[in-house]
Amino acid sequence: MKLDSWRARALIALGLGMFRLWARTLRFGVEDPEKILSASRDQPFILSVWHNRLLLLPPVFSLCFPHRRSVGLISASRDGDFVAILVERFGHGTVRGSSSRKGIIALRQLVDALAAGTNVLITPDGPRGPLYEINQGIIFVAQKSGAAIVPMHLEFANAWRLKSWDRFFVPKPFSEVRILFGAAQRVGPTAGPEEFEHERLRIQNALMKLVEEK
């Protein structure tokens, strides 16, 4: 079904309405010991969250960053079309691309967005995994932009798990949702592949720390 057909537009409007109603039943709590939300008033960040927790990010970003525009990296696939529409309907921007399609162009657009003062969201193990292993793109963006990576995690009291490669989380209605922020991580220049891999693993471990401390 083409996304510009009347049937598609009707289904999208219905789906968005149901999504908003469902999201309003959830109870959100923020844990921000490093004062990231306060610091974000003065600088843009690269927010990083694992792919299997991304469903609630549009309302979460509206809740946590009402004062700063945010842009998300969304897969250029057909599945990504619907995600992009959802993100944009919540008032956020999108950059389309992935590691296998339009990748480098998308990453440079994210660098430009950060230079313009916009927060950037990257799911570093998406869109295909491996699960909980970050790809090189987020390190590239951090090095080129000079912006810090902020590990972010969403923990759900009650959720369904899909049979996808990442066992995607869908919170059940009325579930509690904890939004956790870790310490900002700067990534400097690297002299070669070994240093680059060291930085990649350091950022990966920072994200996993939030998962393990849930």
Task: Give the ranges of each region predicted by the language model.
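Non-catalytic C-terminal accessory region of glycerolipid acyltransferases
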Residues: 1-25, 37, 67, 89, ...
